[in-house]
């Protein structure tokens, strides 16, 4: 039986411990999580050369000023583009190397292609990782793929509207947990429930007893 209690071991840092000086989803943000013992939540994309990198948006413009879609680049191309003209967008391998099992990692897969290449490349990395991790996605295709090919992995579905609620009912037997938008809490389901994203102390007090754990930023 899967042990998913690590998802409740501490609060979850949304895209790492970032602030005005340290951007989200960067190595310094993840180093801080390791130091403070927070669970890391991060986002991943696959590039044209099958490198897997840690970044939230599909377009780079917001954090880098470069108006390019991240999935259209190779890693050598992406590595020349900096966040705040200073920080390199890290690969998942780099992040896992510095974390090295010291804290759990919650990985959101940003896959909209539904062709399985992303998942196949990802498990080449995760199969050899000794630390605790879980996978989550808004895309039901991702849930299906992992249920078929890696049933031992801990898998969650991200819920953000009524459409996803209907999907949950269809996929409840295939998932180990759900990540629910805070305004949909409490969410009645016989699974571990994470709430996202908590950005104020008042929200923390309001939602902390309505789910099993919270994904937070600004308040950690």
Q: Where in this protein do the model-derived segments appear?
A:
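Phosphate-group recognition and catalysis centered on beta-loop-alpha active-site segments
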Residues: 1-220
């Amino acid at each position: 039986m899967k042990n998913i209690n690590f998802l409740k071991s501490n609060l979850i840092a949304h895209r790492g411990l970032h602030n005005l000086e340290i951007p989200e989803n960067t190595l310094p943000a993840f180093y801080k999580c390791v130091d403070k013992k927070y669970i890391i939540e991060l986002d991943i994309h696959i590039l044209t050369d099958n490198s897997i990198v840690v970044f939230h948006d599909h377009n780079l413009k917001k954090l880098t000023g470069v108006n390019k879609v991240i999935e259209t680049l190779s890693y050598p191309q992406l590595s020349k583009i900096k966040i705040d003209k200073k920080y390199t967008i890290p690969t998942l391998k780099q992040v896992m190397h510095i974390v090295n099992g010291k804290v759990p990692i919650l990985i959101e897969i940003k896959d909209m292609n539904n062709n399985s290449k992303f998942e196949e490349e990802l498990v080449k990395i995760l199969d050899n990782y000794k630390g605790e991790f879980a996978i989550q996605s808004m895309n039901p295709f991702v849930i299906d793929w992992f249920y078929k090919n890696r049933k031992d992995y801990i898998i969650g579905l991200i819920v953000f509207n009524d459409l996803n609620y209907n999907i949950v009912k269809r996929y409840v037997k295939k998932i180990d947990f759900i990540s629910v938008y805070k305004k949909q809490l409490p969410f009645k389901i016989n699974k571990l429930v994470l709430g996202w994203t908590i950005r104020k102390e008042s929200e923390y007090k309001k939602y902390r007893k309505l789910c099993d754990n919270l994904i937070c930023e600004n308040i950690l």
